[in-house]
Regions:
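Conserved C-terminal active-site "lid" loop/helix of NAD(P)H-dependent oxidoreductases
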Residues: 253, 272, 309-331
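Conserved mid-core alpha-helix of short-chain dehydrogenase/reductase
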Residues: 74, 116-119, 250, 255-258, ...
């Protein structure tokens, strides 16, 4: 690989594959790392081998490694050999529901795997920007302690202090995270520490709902993609608590990749950013049902379960002020309505089961 190599972990996933394509178009050679653990975690519905085939088709010279990020020596060898100019770390065990069933796998993947990559970068690529895809789950259920106002189709923050959403200064400890959230906190803090302690150009992106037409959404992960998938295929969607009024902000994978490239062009050490669609691209589940029906022409089939998921947010959307201040050339380019239309078109053209 050349000096302009970008190493992308989780390259078969939604964000990883988008980053591979975006950086290739920006002139980088691409080394992807992915052993299709989504198929292990979620079964055939989570399989991303189709995405890898797409990368090999669309990126001339694409190179791929199936190294497991839990394999410390394998990761060290890979980074030593490649000496990437940029490292984008999107690989993860992404489900907070499943983490409780596989706690060792979850922590080894999310926390230890991130440490393996950070140490490999410190040894062999210390000046290369290191971008870690974190999660808003690092805030645990603390956002639920904020005063809320119930509206017709959604919950929202009652305090005008949060009119733009949750900022990076919001506390991340002394709350219920789920085991997934806790393992991601460990990774998030370690990414910051390598940046601040060793002076490395690192950032952790605390993602809201990351989505797009290439997302292999399943019930345990990928809220908007899975919701639209259910709409398109006529599958029943289960709503867990909060009257279906729980709110998420949604960001298209292209806008995620655009921000990552902006960071690479002007890196900082040990930064964190809340990366989401902001209030303008937020929706409740009930509102998402209406948008999906508008995009597909089909009514949503759904059922309601009173018990909410452990640690689930009642309302969460990202305050994008810090991101836009540090990187004023970046902004949301894909509206929620446009994103849902793209997801609906994608699921309509993919061979999927209605079971």
């Amino acid at each position: 690989m050349g000096n302009e190599c970008v190493l992308v972990t989780g390259s078969g996933g939604l964000i990883g594959s988008e980053v591979c394509l975006h950086f290739y178009r920006a002139g980088y050679s691409v080394l992807g790392l992915d052993n299709n653990q989504r198929a292990v975690f979620f079964g055939p519905e989570g399989d991303t081998s189709w995405s890898l085939r797409r990368l090999r088709r669309d990126i001339p010279g694409y190179e791929h490694s199936e190294t497991d990020i839990r394999d410390r020596e394998g990761v060290l060898r890979l980074v030593e050999s490649a000496r990437p100019k940029v490292i984008v770390h999107t690989a993860a065990q992404p489900s907070h529901d499943r983490a409780a069933q596989i706690p060792f796998d979850d922590f080894d993947t999310n926390a230890v795997g991130t440490l393996n990559l950070l140490e490999a970068a410190r040894r062999w690529a210390p000046e290369s920007p290191f971008i870690h895809m974190s999660t808003n789950k690092v805030y645990g259920d603390r956002p639920n302690k904020l005063a809320m106002v119930e509206q017709e189709t959604r919950w929202d923050y009652a305090n005008p202090e949060y009119r733009r959403g949750i900022a990076e200064s919001f506390a991340i400890d002394q709350s219920l995270h789920s085991l997934f959230g806790a393992s991601k906190v460990a990774a998030d803090v370690m990414v910051q520490e390598y940046g601040r302690y060793f002076g490395m150009p690192t950032c952790a992106l605390r993602g809201g709902c990351l989505t797009g037409p290439n997302h292999s959404g399943v019930e345990l992960h990928g809220f908007l993609s899975y919701l639209v998938r259910c709409n398109v295929t006529g599958r029943e969607y289960k709503v867990f608590g909060y009257k279906g009024k729980q709110v998420r902000d949604n960001i298209h994978s292209e806008d995620v990749a655009r921000f990552m490239l902006a960071f690479v062009q002007k890196p900082r050490c040990g930064e964190v950013y809340n990366l989401g669609g902001g209030k303008e691209n937020s929706c409740s589940i009930l509102e998402a049902f209406a948008l999906a029906a508008e995009a597909s022409g089909r009514e949503q089939v759904w059922t309601y379960l009173e018990e909410n998921r452990i640690g689930d947010h009642i309302c969460y959307y990202s305050d994008l002020t810090k991101m836009k201040t540090h990187y004023p050339g970046w902004g949301i380019s894909k509206s929620l309505k446009q994103t849902i239309a793209e997801i609906a078109a994608s699921w309509s053209s993919r061979p999927v089961s209605t079971a």
